[in-house]
Amino acid sequence: MNIDNTQRRFAVMGNNTFTIANRLMTDQKICRLLKYQTKDPFKSIDPITGNKQPDVDGIDLIHKQILIVPKVFDDSTEKMSYIVSVFDDFTVDQLNPDFKISTVRFDIACPYDEWILNEQSLRPYLIMERIDQLFNGQPL
């Protein structure tokens, strides 16, 4: 077995990072929660302002609100919510030394005045819930 192509080497982490980013940017719930800083980001029209809220092209959020490096986009002049994904806590699998076991950590930041969506929902927790549905127990 060519050990350079196994999960034991950090070289595969780049591919895994892009797999995570792709899964996030293709999910409309995540994209809408990040893009639309409104009380109901899931509606096609904001009920308060009447502005259209079309589906979001997730590629526009990469390196701005969906981050694969632990640094927030510098040029932003507007309030935005962010997701940063990083790998953490690496250990070699004792049963299969060709694999490293790690934790994928998602850091979520939202402007304080955009947390409350309605009487029952908080934006960062809805983002966490959706990330959990997309990744918990799922292979990359």
Give the ranges of each region predicted by the language model.
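Small/polar-rich, solvent-exposed N-terminal microdomains that initiate assembly or binding
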Residues: M1-D93
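Short histidine-centered beta-strand/loop micro-motifs
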Residues: Q94-D98, Q120
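Generic low-polarity alpha-helical segments
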Residues: I20, L24, S85, F106, ...
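Acidic-leaning, charged glycine-interspersed low-complexity segments
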Residues: S76-T77, L122-L140
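Short, flexible/disordered intra-domain loops and linkers
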Residues: D4-T6, W115-R123
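Oligomerization/assembly interface segments of phage tail-like spikes and tubes
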Residues: D98-E114, I131
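Residue-level marker of positions within ordered structural domains that often coincide
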Residues: F90, P111, N136
